[in-house]
Amino acid sequence: GRREKMRLQLHFGADYSAGAYGWTLDRDAIRASVDWQLRNLQTDTIDFGFLHCIDELRDLETAWGTLEEILRLKDQGVVRHVGLSSHTPAVVNRLLEEKVLDLVMFSINPAYDYSAGGEFAIGGAQERMDLYRRCEAEGVGISVMKAFSGGQLLDEKTSPLGCALTEYQCIQYALDKPGVLTVLPGVR
C-alpha cells in the first residue's frame, strides 16, 4: 500500500490531547500521544522519532527520559531513526555529542542565519554554519523548517531583510547549506 511510499515523522513531546497543539515532557503523556498517533495512522512503525522542540539546554536536561523512550522504541523496531527538532545550535551540538541522532529538524533561512529577525534566529552566523558543517561531517542529516520565516520573507512589508524573497530563493538558500537533505515548507 501507500505506507511503504511515505516517511512518517512523529514528534515525541507534541501533545494534542486537549484538541490543540501543546508541548510536554511528561513520559506518560508522550507514550499516550504516540500510541494514539500510531493507532490513528494505522501503522506500527515510525520512520523518524523526534525529540520535539528542545530550544533550551535546561529543557534538554529534562528531556532525557523522552530520548530514552525513543531509543527504547528504536531497539524494539518501532522507531527507525532518531531525530531532534530545535532552533538552537547549542542544544543540537550538545545532543550530537551523544551520537544517537540521524536527523535534525532545524530552522534555516537567510534572516535567521544572519540574525536579521525572529524569535527563532538563535545563534550567530558562524555558530549556525559550524553546526551545518558538523552535521554533514557526522552524517546527521538536516531537515529544514521555517524556510520562509513563517511567510515573512515572502512579503516586502514583513521581511526583516527589507525585500521580499521568492519561495524558490528561500528553498534554494536552505538546500545550499551543508548537511541539508530536505526542506519542509509550511502550509497555510
Task: Describe the predicted segments one by one.
Residues 1-12, 44:
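N-terminal binding-site loop/beta-alpha segment at the start of enzyme catalytic domains
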Residues 4, 32, 41-44, 77, ...:
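Structured loop/turn residues at beta-strand edges in well-structured enzyme cores
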Residues 8-10, 47-50, 84-85:
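Beta-strand segments within the central parallel beta-sheet cores of soluble alpha/beta enzyme folds
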Residues 12-31, 57, 154-164:
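Active-site mouth loops of central-metabolism enzymes
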Residues 28-38, 69:
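Short, well-ordered amphipathic alpha-helical segments that serve as non-catalytic structural scaffolds
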Residues 36-58:
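Active-site groove signature of glycoside hydrolases
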Residues 54-188:
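Beta/alpha (TIM)-barrel catalytic core signal, keyed to glycine-rich beta->alpha loops juxtaposed to Asp/Glu
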